[in-house]
């Protein structure tokens, strides 16, 4: 009987309209994405990058810790030894379609060579465009070096 009276007096509709009026005059919580962007957390894990030292040499020492720790097996590294005895990578590939953006590669790196940058807009129409080689990763690092360095500096005490 109570349900009949509620439906007779349009209780559900009145309740729904009251809820609509309650939120009608509050500020919007959505953003117009391509034109407006929300702030990104300092610990955001986006597109990968390889960093260089200030004098231009790449930081990666080919220890392969990032390749070993990657749970998705998205990283492939090949390395050669130089005349001075140091090791450097000849091939450093990341398959971004396999990557789960966990950040373990960044945590495992002893020299902060591989980092996850601030970019989240790197969609592609082909699978091959999402397999990043060493040159692409170094270009990403060069492009975002200031942002990456400040991000690592802010996060240093928590590492």
Curated annotation (Swiss-Prot):
Domain 4Fe-4S ferredoxin-type: 51-80, 90-119
GO-annotated molecular function: 4 iron, 4 sulfur cluster binding; iron ion binding; NADH:ubiquinone reductase (non-electrogenic) activity; quinone binding
Subcellular location, principal: membrane
GO biological process, one term: aerobic respiration
Group of enzyme by EC: translocase
HAMAP family reported in the protein's UniProt record: NDH1_NuoI
Name the UniProt record assigns to this protein: NADH-quinone oxidoreductase subunit I
Species per Swiss-Prot/TrEMBL record: Rickettsia rickettsii (strain Sheila Smith)
């Amino acid at each position: 009987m109570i349900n009949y009276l509620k439906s007779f007096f349009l209780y559900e509709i009145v309740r729904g309209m009251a809820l609509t009026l309650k939120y009608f005059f509050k500020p919007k919580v959505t953003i117009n994405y391509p034109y407006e962007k929300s702030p990104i957390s300092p610990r955001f894990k986006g597109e990968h990058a390889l960093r260089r030292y200030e004098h231009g040499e790449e930081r990666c020492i080919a220890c392969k810790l990032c390749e070993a720790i990657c749970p998705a097996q998205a990283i492939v590294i090949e390395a050669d030894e130089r005349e001075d005895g140091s090791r450097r990578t000849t091939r450093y590939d990341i398959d971004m379609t396999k990557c789960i953006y966990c950040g373990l590669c960044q945590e495992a790196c002893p020299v902060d060579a591989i980092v996850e940058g601030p970019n989240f807009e790197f969609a592609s129409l082909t699978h091959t465009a999402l397999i990043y080689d060493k040159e692409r990763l170094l270009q990403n690092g060069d492009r975002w070096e200031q942002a990456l360095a400040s991000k690592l500096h802010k996060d240093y005490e928590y590492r």
